[in-house]
């Protein structure tokens, strides 16, 4: 009998990009994942085969049970929620969930750009 891991995800990754954090998180979670590496220098993110997966042509992106999830903060939240037993994110309904989300999105919208754009 074959069993399926309903938490299996496919990560579309490009080295030296924001997808490195998602790859590190998958490892930290001990997640079951398949890795597809894109070469941004050769424009693989703009080829039809990848645009069929992610019409925005950006990385990182994951596919989980047929659903596409993109954007770094959304990916971190989604994956932490997919593996609640790791305790990496407060559960929905936990009083710390709001502050957790605030700092997570502050990082992606304010802190990281300040570091990258200086």
PLM segments and residue spans:
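GST-like domain detector, emphasizing the conserved glutathione-binding G-site
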Residues: 2-118
